[in-house]
Amino acid sequence: MAEEVNGIINVYKEAGYTSHDVVAKLRGILHQKKIGHTGTLDPAATGVLPVCCGKATKVCELLTDKEKSYRAVCKLGVITDTQDTTGTVLQTKDISGVTQDELSDTIQSFVGDIMQIPPMYSAIKVGGRKLYELAREGKEIERKPRPVTIYAIDIKDIDLENGSFTMDVTCSKGTYIRTLCHDIGEKLGVGAAMDQLLRTKVLIFEVDQALTLAQIEERIQQEDRSFVLPVDQLFTQYPKMQVADEEAAKMLRNGNPITIGKLKSFNEVKKYQNKSRVLVYNENGEFRAIYELRGNYYRVVKMF
């Protein structure tokens, strides 16, 4: 039996797959169950979906919380029940009065901390049921606005002749890009719906390095695992430390606190953004844990 894959795979999610579909197919390709994704992408959306395998599933929540980047194509003058063009058209409006400057200013007005009302067609649960399940039954319930942050919007193209615009968006966890498109259209007074969505980046994972499921399967058949990112490479902001003796090695194996003098530097000297947290390696140089300095002891944050 092949050795278990431990690390993060930068999957290119193709249109038509749910995030759960990707995980299910990867379980078949890798022949292992311990796999988890790091944040849902709509079935119609494409792009970066980091998938954690084996021991790396312990960092899933750390990746889910990070900012993400997208490229979205939005259609002006149309309002749908799903806030994207896959939904039922509820209303169409004339956009002939919209100018390029007005559209550009409206788009940029959403940069910063904003409040978003989640769409009915979303996986948010209310009373134990997902909103999209209620929406499919023709029900609409009140949703509370949620705070999200739009860090940047770069307008890539405005095509008023065809009633569309393309933008690159960097945003916080929990941001709905189709809701952003909808809200831009609403503020303009003409409506808008998202037409295409590509997730371009999550942390260090970029779309041009992402692999499709077919490409991953081919690599695995060739016994090539070079595309699997080891967990410690996610945390380059933390210094690397190695156990200094057998006593420290035993402490590490058990996840016990380790005194400062029992860890030695594993790195070339350089400045780190965060010195209180360290990556700890065993006597064989294998990454085993993230520890945090509290007083005179390093205490475990996460074991791997």
Q: Which residues make up each language-model segment?
A:
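Accessory RNA 3′-end/elbow-binding domains used by RNA modification enzymes
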Residues: M1-E14, H20-H37, L41, A45, ...
